[in-house]
Amino acid sequence: MKALVVYDPKSKFTLEALKAVEYKLAELENLELVYVADHNHERMENPKEYNLKMEKEGPEWITPEPEVMEQIKDADILMTSFCGVTRAMLEAGKNLKLVFMMRSGWENCNVKAAKELGIPVCNCPSRLAEPVADLTVAMMICECRGILRGNRDILNGEWNQNDIYNDTTNAALCNLRI
C-alpha cells in the first residue's frame, strides 16, 4: 500500500511530525510512504494571499505539481496539509482509497469531486483543541487581571494607581462568598 505525502517545504512541522511517527505508520500493512514537496504556494508572492484565496475559491485554481500527478497514479492514500487537492489529482489517483487532510479544515480539498469519485476525505478537527484551550485560559487570566487594559494605559503614558485588577487583596477576595 502506498501513501503519498504532499508536504509544504516551507513548513518543517508537517514533515518532521510525519517523520517522527513514520515507524508507526510503516506497521500498517507494509505502508510505503512517498514524500513529495508541494511548491504551488511558492508561486504566490504572499502565502497569506494563497491561503485566503484557497479559503474563498477552493483548490481548483491551482495547477498540481507534475511530480504529485505522477506519484498519485498508484497511491492508495493521499496525505496533505496545505496542498490543494483538485479534481484532476483525484481522477489521476485511480487507486485512491482515502484523502487525509492533516489540518482541521477542508477548504483546500475538492470534497465534492472526492464524493463523486467515492473517495472518503477525513481531517483532524481536534488538531487545534489544545492550543485553543490554552488561549482561552490565557485570555481569561488577562481579563480577570486587567492585563490588556493595563498594557494599553502604560503604552498611552498613563498609570491608574487605583486599578482594582492589580489590587491583590481585591483579587484574593473577589470570588469569596459570605
Predicted regions and their residues:
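A short, aliphatic-rich alpha-helical micro-motif
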Residues: 69-72, 90-93, 173
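Rossmann-fold NAD(P)-binding glycine/threonine-rich loop
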Residues: 107-119
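ADP-ribose/adenylate-binding Rossmann-like module
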Residues: 96-108
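A short helix->loop->beta-strand "cap" motif at the edges of active sites that frequently abuts
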Residues: 93-98, 117-119
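N-terminal glycine-/charge-rich "phosphate-binding" loop or analogous flexible N-terminal tail
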Residues: 1-75
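Phosphate-binding beta-alpha-beta segment of Rossmann-like dinucleotide-binding domains, i.e.
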Residues: 117, 125-177
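Short His-centered aromatic/hydrophobic patch
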Residues: 82
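Structural motif
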Residues: 76-77, 98
